[in-house]
């Protein structure tokens, strides 16, 4: 457990102020377990991320470089150093099918390397959330969970900028992207569980932290013991999927 505590402390280094009331009505206890990022000092800046794989015709792109910079701060140090993020699966580019998602990841030539994987989901209300996995998502024949303590869940939303602006500057964007990450708690080992009919991350007390169906049409999200997460979707515990992407980091 000491290693886990050290990891949680390292996640908190250099973080901005926690805006406990900015997203929903989460309790202070849940907020204290979550990790939020606003910006970092220039001395801590990593080389910029390069996104590879979007088609020129892809209109609904879920991931931006700004979001990548926030997400990479939660990843293991060796993964943070990678600058290339490669799109392996996109609902818009490859079709709405969990089988297609698994198939695209199955033939990833780097799936045996020390890389990471990010799943990004958008719901009908514009909420963007997902998870990070230390290994590729793949179905298992038996009820077997995989993944390790590097896995986490996350959600990202636009929140009000608390800095005071001149009243004449009302036309400028007064919102910032803010990430809330939910790291591995050590309470159980239910990081990732995938079958031919669903993909999930986190579990406990009969609920999944994140679960999506084989048609990539619907999903559910509940607080889980694995990650101590809040409900991830803006729609609530049950959500409709608008977009899904899976990226390889490294």
Swiss-Prot record:
Pfam families: TLD. Keywords: Mitochondrion. Residues 61-250 form the TLDc domain. It comes from the Eukaryota. GO terms for cellular component: mitochondrion; nucleus. One of its GO terms (biological process) is response to oxidative stress. It is found in: Mitochondrion. Coiled coil: none annotated. Disulfide bonds: none annotated. Belongs to the OXR1 family. May be involved in protection from oxidative damage. This is Oxidation resistance protein 1.
